[in-house]
Amino acid sequence: MGRIAGFCSYDPMKTKLAGAMNLFMSGSAFIYYGEEIGMPGSGNDPSKRAPFFWNDARDNGTTTPPPECALPEEYPFGSLETQMADDNSLWNYYRQAIAIRQALPTLSHGRTTAETALNAGCVSAFRKTWNDQSVIVLMNIDTVAASVDLSAYGDWTLAASLSADGNEIVLNDTTLELPAFGTAVLIPSV
């Protein structure tokens, strides 16, 4: 099995959303090393065991690749060192997604049901329920922003959000504004 970035054609926004999809599903999340920085790795087995991209100089802790391992000339998303300095990097996106998963255990433990009334256009919505707690996750899988009407759902609060393109996710009264490839996690208002 290859890494997510390759399946997403190294598109930063699609790769970020795919990471959120993985991390917001129930059960144990699995991140194969390098997934969080968008490393390539598909096809033959040696390419899946490439050295981790620690820095652009490739000389700090980098191991010798296995024979027949195809290393890219440039890192598709930059090295870890580069991404740590970029607030909008894939690595920082993964850190945010993991923090949300840890802060809202219903995401990892909850039973998933579709929220078909909120699925409009390219917005996918599902509810996670665990220990009498619920969250609703909405993901915009389109290249353009989307508005979602929540008026039939009562009072919900935007608990967390992930923006793939840096645009803010906003809940105005009963309308949720989701940018392209944006993810919102709603909790019932207290």
Regions found by a protein language model. Give the residues of each.
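Beta-strand-rich binding/interaction modules
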Residues: 145-164
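C-terminal beta-strand-rich structural cap/linker in extracellular carbohydrate-active enzymes
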Residues: 171-190
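Solvent-exposed beta-strand/loop surfaces of large extracellular or lumenal domains
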Residues: 160-174
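Active-site clefts of carbohydrate-active enzymes
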Residues: 1-10
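Loop/helix patches that line or flank the sugar-binding groove of alpha-linked glycan CAZymes
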Residues: 9-135, 141-146
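Short, flexible beta-strand-to-coil junctions
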Residues: 129-131, 163, 189-190
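Generic detection of short hydrophobic beta-strand segments and adjacent strand-loop junctions
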Residues: 52, 146-150, 176-178
